[in-house]
A protein has these predicted regions:
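Cys-nucleophile CN-hydrolase/nitrilase-fold catalytic domain and related Cys-dependent amidase chemistry
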Residues: 10-11, 19-91
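Short, intrinsically disordered, charge-balanced linker/junction segments flanking boundaries
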Residues: 147-153
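Short beta-strand segments enriched in small/hydrophobic residues
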Residues: 1-4
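Short, acidic/polar
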Residues: 12-22, 136-143
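Short secondary-structure boundary/capping elements
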Residues: 12, 51-54, 111-113, 137
């Protein structure tokens, strides 16, 4: 989904996506932008959420309502650390998460903690691997044949 993300305004962005979804044709997978609720920002301490925060509550509702897999990322806080965390929210209410492994050296590494584990999950017969932005610059990470995925998002 293409959208103009409103700088550091979680509620406004959730409302904006809700409006865009009204005109979206039926879809198996809806892919939202990186940090779609805040835009890319280093204001993690004031904008971070847990995996059960307003972003994931809302996305889970959308997944069920539209019977689609929703994928995107948000600023997550866990154990006093901040992550650029990707999610996949399933129509049945399940959720899986991936923390961005390769942080951009323009300051992202000073705020966020890098993830350490890839994520491959199954949806509608497809094995799907999640990556976030700068991860794509590290093809050996993504070409790992042991991951056995069909689709990279």
């Amino acid at each position: 989904m293409q959208m103009d993300v409103i700088w550091e305004d979680i509620n406004a962005n959730l409302n904006h996506v809700e409006e865009l979804l009204k005109d979206l044709p039926e879809s198996d997978i809806v892919v939202l932008p990186e940090m779609f609720t805040t835009a890319f920002t280093i204001s993690a301490p004031t904008l971070a959420e847990g995996n059960d925060g307003i972003t994931m509550q809302t996305v889970s509702q959308w997944a069920k309502k539209y019977n689609s897999l929703f994928v995107g990322s948000f600023i997550a806080e866990e154990g006093g650390r901040y992550y650029n965390r990707a999610f996949a929210a399933f129509p049945n209410g399940n959720k899986v998460f991936y923390d961005k492994r390769h942080l951009f050296l323009g300051g992202e590494e000073r705020i966020f903690t890098a993830g350490s584990e890839p994520l491959v999950f199954e949806y509608e017969g497809w094995n799907i691997n999640l990556a976030i932005c700068f991860d794509l610059r590290f093809p050996t990470w993504l070409r790992n044949k042991d991951l056995k995925y069909d689709l990279l998002i």
